A protein has these predicted regions:
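A conserved ligand/cofactor-binding region detector
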Residues: 8-161, 170-260
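Conserved phosphate/anionic-ligand binding catalytic regions in large, soluble enzymes, centered on
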Residues: 165-167
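C-terminal motif of bacterial Sec signal peptides marking the signal peptidase cleavage site
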Residues: 3-4
Length: 260
């Protein structure tokens, strides 16, 4: 489920404070990585912005249904700061969402901030209505609801949903799901042979907006079109970026406005 929007009384003032420096930091990382193609392009309906991990989950001594779990107000204050930034950066076109992951590691809860390009996200739900319809999702469903359900779904449905919503081609999503099913069924857990199609970002040419394809597969016009469109957006970003670089860091909010 999503992080609650209401706050305890001693945290409510923190929630309402918007930290521009934190917003610049989040956006700077986003623009330098694959979220550029959500923030300044329509290639990716959603992208990762920031990974967080805090000691707020149950530890091994706690039981299901316990009322008093998280005592770390300082950690919750940090989360509320990120929530305030998400709220401040969201508008009619983009939505920033903080989603807690289902799995925990001891008492550590992992969370992720995502940015959604709402119209493109809705189009993707419509395109794959036969898949997303099983939860009653339509193009009008709030992305926050979609992600809160998908994150807690079964493994393969979760993987397929994220594959579509991160903007990977249908054939790549099919391959990823089926190849991992085969690997799971194999007693030796042997990885199915594959190649990778990498789309460059400012931070590097590989390992960010990247998807797997069958070993024998040759990239087609769809892959080439994605690459060319991304390259055009990245070139524009590279040209503008230096003008917004200051000794204190990248003035990412102003740069993002210029890129829109």
């Amino acid at each position: 489920m999503l992080m609650a929007c209401s706050a305890p009384k001693n945290l409510s003032s923190t929630l309402n404070k918007y930290n521009p420096s934190l917003a610049d930091s989040l956006l700077a990382y986003s623009l330098d990585h694959e979220a550029l193609y959500t923030l300044a392009d329509t290639l990716k309906p959603m992208s990762s912005v920031k990974f967080l991990s805090y000691a707020i989950a149950k530890d091994s001594s706690m039981q299901d249904g316990e009322a008093f779990v998280t005592q770390q107000d300082s950690l919750l204050q940090l989360i509320y700061q990120y929530q305030a930034v998400c709220k401040a950066l969201s508008n009619d076109t983009w939505q920033f969402i903080l989603v807690p992951f289902q799995r925990t590691e001891k008492n550590m809860r992992n969370l992720e901030i995502y940015v959604i390009r709402k119209a493109v996200f809705a189009d993707k739900i419509k395109q794959y209505q036969s898949f997303f319809g099983q939860w009653g999702f339509t193009p009008n469903t709030d992305p926050a609801v979609v992600l809160s359900v998908i994150e807690y779904e079964t493994r393969w449905d979760r993987n397929r949903a994220y594959g579509y919503l991160f903007g990977y081609p249908a054939y790549a999503v099919d391959f990823f799901v089926e190849a991992n099913k085969m690997q799971q069924a194999d007693v030796n857990k042997k990885i199915v042979p594959r190649n990778f199609f990498a789309i460059p970002v400012f931070a590097g040419n590989q390992g960010y907006f990247t998807y797997a394809m069958p070993k024998s597969y040759q990239p087609n016009e769809l892959d080439s079109a994605i690459y060319r469109k991304a390259q055009s957006t990245l070139n524009q970003y590279r040209q503008l970026r230096s003008s917004y670089l200051r000794p204190s860091g990248l003035k990412a909010q102003a740069l993002w406005k210029q890129l829109r």
